[in-house]
């Protein structure tokens, strides 16, 4: 599993090591271990995606706009009890593509992860890794959930 806390530091990491701003902006990432960030997250749970900082698989996360009031309340208690374990990000509008589901086409959310090779020259490979949210309406595009 990767540590999602690093997402919050990416603009500073790029600036420090490369001496330049990021070309493609990073998704804003709120660290629940930070008092101001945690206060913002708790006030905006209905707008944010909250993830465990050191876990993978797309499980145990809260997609605020799709969560019930009770689910948001339970997550607020988890965040308060163990703030270091959580980060939050805005809910993104993912692309949709036709996907074969049960023998016919249906629209599903996807994400695309490009690959770049670095050596004497830098190459952006054509295509990339595309992951799909197979559950209708889901925003969770994770290979461990069939995507």
Where are these regions (language model features)?
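Domain-scale recognition of functional cores that engage charged ligands
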Residues: 1-145
